[in-house]
């Protein structure tokens, strides 16, 4: 059974981010997570819940994905959050990521911001991406 395209995309993105020495240095270690960590000190990056829609036609099948990466920064504040977002953008925008059982047609960063979190001590950076995939034949 082929891998779910959203999971294949998240796996490839996670591998790309974890393999980058500059991002690892910015985060102070391997702090890119598929789900929110417990008791991990900021800064760190967490994948949000993906949204996937079919874009099938009479001749082709495929999916559109909307993904969100969350960046949490404390002492470095908004500046640190934006620096991490900029690195994520460099690594992911139009990246030729290899996917299991699927082909990545495109991957684009479409929105980013950094806001003071409700607790007043953290900054919450948000990076949204859009991707399209189709299954390998």
Feature names for model-found ranges:
Residues 1-57, 95-100:
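Small/polar-rich, solvent-exposed N-terminal microdomains that initiate assembly or binding
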Residues 52-55, 74, 114-115:
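Short beta-turn/strand-loop junction motif enriched in small, turn-promoting residues
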Residues 71-94:
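Mid-chain, well-packed structural core segment of small domains
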